Amino acid sequence: MELNFMRILATIINFIILILILKHFFWDKIKRAIDARQEAIDETILKADEDAEKARRLRLDNERILKSAKEDGRKLREEQKKEADRIYKEIVDDAHREAESIINRANIEIQREEEKVKYELKQQVVDISVMLSEKALGESIDESKHRELINDFIEKVGI
C-alpha cells in the first residue's frame, strides 16, 4: 500500500473546507444550542441550590418554631402547676381557717356550757344547803340572807 501524497493532501484540504463550510453555516446554531443547554444546566443547578437553601431555611424555621412551641408548652405547664399549687394552698389554708374557727366556736361553746353547769351546780348546792339548814334548825330562816351567806361561802371555797 503506497502512500499517495497528493491524495492525503487533497483529503486534508477537503476536510478543512468541510470544517469551514460547517463552521460558516452551522457553527452559530451549534454554539447557540450548546450555550442554551449550558444555560439551562446552569439555571437548573442554580434553582436546585436555591431550593436547597430554601429547604434549609424552612427546616431551621420549623426547628425554631418547634423549639418555641416546646418552650411555650413548658412555660404553660409551669404556670398551670403554679396556679394549681396556689389554688391547692388556698383551699388548704381555707380549710385550716375553717377548722380553727370551728374549734374556737366549740371551745367557746364548751366554756359557756361549763359556766352554765357551774352556775346550775352552785344553785343546786345553795338550794340543798338551804333545805338542809331548815331541816336542821327545824324552822324557816330568811331565805335571801341564807342564800347570800351560802353564795359567799361557795365563792370563797372556789366552786
From Swiss-Prot:
SUPFAM superfamilies: F1F0 ATP synthase subunit B, membrane domain. It is a single-pass membrane protein. GO terms for cellular component: plasma membrane; proton-transporting ATP synthase complex. The keyword Magnesium does not apply. Keywords: ATP synthesis, Cell membrane, CF(0), Hydrogen ion transport, Ion transport, Membrane, Transmembrane, Transmembrane helix, Transport. Its main location: membrane. InterPro entries: ATP_synth_B-like_membr_sf, ATP_synth_b/b'su_bac/chlpt, ATP_synth_F0_bsu_bac, ATP_synthase_B_chain. It is found in: Cell membrane. It comes from the Bacteria. GO terms for molecular function: proton-transporting ATP synthase activity, rotational mechanism; proton-transporting ATPase activity, rotational mechanism. The chain crosses the membrane at residues 8-28. PANTHER family: ATP SYNTHASE SUBUNIT B, ATP SYNTHASE SUBUNIT B', CHLOROPLASTIC. Belongs to the ATPase B chain family. F-type ATPases have 2 components, F(1) - the catalytic core - and F(0) - the membrane proton channel. F(1) has five subunits: alpha(3), beta(3), gamma(1), delta(1), epsilon(1). F(0) has three main subunits: a(1), b(2) and c(10-14). The alpha and beta chains form an alternating ring which encloses part of the gamma chain. F(1) is attached to F(0) by a central stalk formed by the gamma and epsilon chains, while a peripheral stalk is formed by the delta and b chains. HAMAP family: ATP_synth_b_bprime. This is ATP synthase subunit b. The gene is atpF.
